């Protein structure tokens, strides 16, 4: 047999490790993907019941008459925080009910800052758009974040129901103020983490 050069053991060890690198990377990626999927789909945080509010300077939201029908909404700023007040068809923990019986008006206020990446959420009443663009089928309007497609349920006290957000939207404390016989909605507090 012809003379063969000696086998380089260091090179052989390197080759043995090089084939392991893609396997380790793929395994790490799979573990991360499973962990992320679990966190996004099964580890969403429930809103506090009852909520704890931190006081804020009182600001006017809108006259009560502007909330004439369910899902009517008004945006406003509370201490520099973008917020929304929504009339909902039933009472929600942390919300405000004005009146009684069939004439009752149920309102809930939320911060409009998404708990995922701090983008601004909007009340979305187009159910087909929510189903198509946000991949969430629902039978009622939702608060949606167009940045990363998180969806929050106003009747669920702002609970994150779809998308990467796992924490609920902070609720805003709403009150009724009467001035000159006309009822108005004001805001004077924001939910704390507890």
Where is each model-derived feature located?
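Soluble extracytoplasmic domains of inner/organellar membrane proteins
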Residues: 115, 146-148
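Short cysteine/histidine-rich metal-coordination sites, predominantly Zn2+-binding motifs
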Residues: 128-146, 159-169
